From Swiss-Prot:
Organism of derivation: Haemophilus influenzae (strain ATCC 51907 / DSM 11121 / KW20 / Rd)
Function recorded in the entry: Trims short 3' overhangs of a variety of RNA species, leaving a one or two nucleotide 3' overhang. Responsible for the end-turnover of tRNA: specifically removes the terminal AMP residue from uncharged tRNA (tRNA-C-C-A). Also appears to be involved in tRNA biosynthesis.
Protein name: Ribonuclease T
Any one GO BP annotation for this protein: DNA replication proofreading
GO molecular function: 3'-5' exonuclease activity; magnesium ion binding; nucleic acid binding; RNA exonuclease activity, producing 5'-phosphomonoesters
Ranges where the Exonuclease domain occurs: 23-197
Residues involved in Mg(2+) 1 binding: 26
Residues that, per the record, bind Mg(2+) 2: 26, 28, 184, 189
Required co-factors: Mg(2+)
Taxonomic superkingdom: Bacteria
Keywords: Exonuclease, Hydrolase, Magnesium, Metal-binding, Nuclease, tRNA processing
Keyword Nucleus annotated: no
Record text on subunit structure and interactions: Homodimer.
Gene: rnt
Active site: 184 (proton donor/acceptor)
Length: 229
């Protein structure tokens, strides 16, 4: 169907999250302080909704990033994520290039989905959001598409749905393959988180959750139209 008007109200992405366009994000860093510690890797995946109302991963971007000038580098963090910031094969770009590329991809997806604003989806989302927002502020990139503080945290959602808050455990509960050797790669973790978020949203739909809510909204819209006639 090319005409979105032919697709049921609740099967359109713009109506699923109150006009928000969800974007899966994962970052790898040189510490925990978004203002002082270096952002070293960033990956993002947008989502799309099919005509039956199911979410799927869509576009992706991935950047290795050079530490900003004066950034703090915590050796323990590098040991944890295995990043060698001096390896020329990283192909690292500046924060400016990474944030610009991210925002461009997100704004295109947001426009195509007819959404009003984008929202970060991440595992322990406050951490990832803080680094994205700090980098956006440092670089001065305009037209930030993301809500300044709203977010969807898959750790909280997985805790509610599966009783699991660790990404690998939540993926296992959802029967999503997870290779521990690839963990702490921003792109791999983003891909797993995207699959996890889609699974949880789609599973709720299959259980009769969101369609029930949307049906009430559709009924209200129909009633309003009939009243206006």
């Amino acid at each position: 169907m090319s005409d979105s008007q032919e697709i049921p109200y609740h099967n359109q992405l713009k109506n699923r999250f109150r006009g928000y366009f969800p974007v899966i994000i994962d970052v790898e860093t040189a510490g925990f302080d978004a203002k002082k510690d270096a952002l070293l890797e960033l990956a993002a995946i947008t989502l799309k909704m099919d005509e039956n109302g199911y979410l799927h991963p869509d576009q992706k971007c991935h950047f290795h990033i050079k530490p900003f000038e004066g950034a703090n580098i915590n050796p323990e963090s590098l040991k944890f994520n295995g990043i060698d910031i001096h390896n020329p094969l990283r192909g690292a770009v500046s924060e400016l290039d990474a944030i610009t590329g991210l925002f461009q991809m997100v704004r295109r997806g947001q426009k195509d989905a007819d959404c009003q604003r984008s929202i970060i989806v991440a595992h322990n989302a406050a951490f990832d959001q803080s680094f994205v927002m700090a980098a956006a502020e440092r670089t001065g990139v305009k037209r930030n598409p993301f809500h300044p503080f709203g977010m969807f945290d898959t750790a909280s959602l997985a805790g509610l749905m599966f009783g699991q808050t660790v990404l690998v455990k939540a993926c296992q509960a959802a029967k999503i393959p997870f290779d521990g050797k690839q963990a702490h790669s921003a792109l791999y973790d983003t891909e797993r988180t995207a699959k996890l978020f889609c699974y949880m949203v789609n599973h709720l739909k299959d259980l009769g959750g969101f369609p029930h809510i949307a049906s009430e909204l559709e009924q209200e819209k129909t009633t309003e139209k009939e009243t206006a006639l």
